[in-house]
C-alpha cells in the first residue's frame, strides 16, 4: 500500500517541502519546493502565505505531514536521569529543567533524545529540548491554516544529524553545523551517537559573522570537553545552510576547526 509523506522544513526565513511517495517496493521523491518568507508584519510574505503557495503548487491530497521548525527556538540541556522508563522520564523532565531555565514548566513543550541508545539499568543520559508554547504556537497556527496536522514535529538539522550519526563509523567523530543568516546550530557526533546540540545567535552578514561563528563553536566544544568524559576528536566537519553563501565562512571554519 502506497503512502504520501510531505516533509516541511521551516527555517527562520525559508520553508522547504519534499513530497515523498512511499511503498513496500520503493521510496520516490514526487515533488519539492523552496520558498522564502518574512515576518508577520508582512502578511503577503508570511509563513502562512508561503504554506498557502505550497498547497497551490503541490497536490497534497492524502498526505501525512512531518515538520521541522528552527532549532534556535529550543533550549537544550544534557541531563542524567536515575531510571530508564520513558514514561517516568517524561514525568520528571519538567522538574529537572525548571531549575535551569527562566521559564515555568507549564509554559514549555518538552521532549528528549537518549544518548546511550536504549536506556538500560538505572541511568539514562539524554538531551532535553524545551520550547516555549508561545514560540511554538505561530508555527502550529500557520500549519493549521493549510489543514496540516503533523504526524511528527522535530527541529531543523536534527534528522540530518541523526542520519549522519547512523551512517558514521563508531570510531570516527564529526561536527555537523547548520548555518543560516542569523543563527547557527552545532551538533556534536561522537562515533555514531549524537551527544550535544547547541544553537547560538549570529550577526547579520558582514566581517564579524565568520569569526563569531568560529568563536561560538570553539567555546561550545571547550565546555563540552570539560564536562564530558568522552574522548572527542572530530575528523570531519559538515556544514549546511543558506548562511554558507557568504564567501569567507568556509575558509574561516577550515582554519579554526
Which residues does each PLM region occupy?
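Buried hydrophobic packing residues in well-ordered domains
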Residues: 17, 67, 96-97, 143, ...
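Active-site neighborhood for divalent-cation/phosphate handling
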Residues: 64, 68-167
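Glycine-rich phosphate-binding loop plus the immediately following alpha-helix
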Residues: 136-160, 193-231
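Glycine-rich phosphate-binding loops at beta-strand->alpha-helix junctions
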Residues: 232-256
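N-terminal phosphate-binding loop and adjacent alpha-helix
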Residues: 30-57, 123, 204-224
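Gly/Thr-rich phosphate-binding beta-strand-loop-beta motif of the actin/hexokinase/Hsp70
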Residues: 1-35, 65-70, 164-196
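Phosphate-interacting basic helix/loop segments used at nucleotide- and nucleic-acid interfaces
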Residues: 1-2, 48-59, 164-172, 224-225
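Phosphate/pyrophosphate-binding loops at sites that engage ATP/ADP/AMP, CoA/4′-phosphopantetheine
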Residues: 51-64, 146, 220-236
